[in-house]
Amino acid sequence: MVVEKQTKYEEFRLKRVEENKKRMEALNLPKLSQILNSTSVKISPMKKRSIPRTPEKKMVDVKRVHIQRRGVGKKRDLLNRVYVSEEIRDEAISRANKFQDELGSGYPSFVKSMLQSHVSGGFWLGLPVQFCKSHLGLHDGVITLIDEEGEEYETIYLARKNGLSGGWMGFAVAHNLAYGDTLVFELVRRTAFKVYITRVGSCGESSKDMS
């Protein structure tokens, strides 16, 4: 009985195998299986992402460079003369008035004591109104300032404002003018002044000695 059962089972198994084989052949599965087995799958390596490089920051040691201004070596000690007493300032005006009286040239002249606005900041020099009306005319123009060395400096005269504008700063800086210095302006030509400087606190010394 046992042998008979095994034989029937074997026949049934073989029959199923044959049926499955025929189905695979009908679907062309054997050939597909061979292709899959024979083909090697190539796996591409992962590409590295390019990360933008951050530029390196370098610390730079910047040294301060002191640039010396032109004419610093020729400056007088102006800081000590910014706030001179009225007594000292009046003494400089008195000496300038005396110098004016001794000119004896017959040319029109006037005395002008320097204020802060004349020698720093805006560098504007107002002239006596009556002197301007009498001797300088009603129109703007160029007025030349001649120092005691004979050097000439052109300035712009503004008739409506009765004063010197452009060019006056150059004269003031070139002669190291400071608060309290007193100037005598002598009109030697219609558009030219000879300028004499009395330094405040100079104790009678000439402007040449104090420059």
Curated annotation (Swiss-Prot):
<dbReference type="InterPro" id="IPR015300">
    <property type="entry name" value="DNA-bd_pseudobarrel_sf"/>
</dbReference>
<dbReference type="GO" id="GO:0005634">
    <property type="term" value="C:nucleus"/>
</dbReference>
<feature type="DNA-binding region" description="TF-B3">
    <location>
        <begin position="110"/>
        <end position="201"/>
    </location>
</feature>
<keyword id="KW-0805">Transcription regulation</keyword>
<keyword id="KW-0238">DNA-binding</keyword>
<dbReference type="GO" id="GO:0003677">
    <property type="term" value="F:DNA binding"/>
</dbReference>
<keyword id="KW-0804">Transcription</keyword>
<dbReference type="InterPro" id="IPR003340">
    <property type="entry name" value="B3_DNA-bd"/>
</dbReference>
<dbReference type="InterPro" id="IPR044837">
    <property type="entry name" value="REM16-like"/>
</dbReference>
<keyword id="KW-0539">Nucleus</keyword>
<dbReference type="Pfam" id="PF02362">
    <property type="entry name" value="B3"/>
</dbReference>
<protein>
    <recommendedName>
        <fullName>B3 domain-containing protein At5g42700</fullName>
    </recommendedName>
</protein>
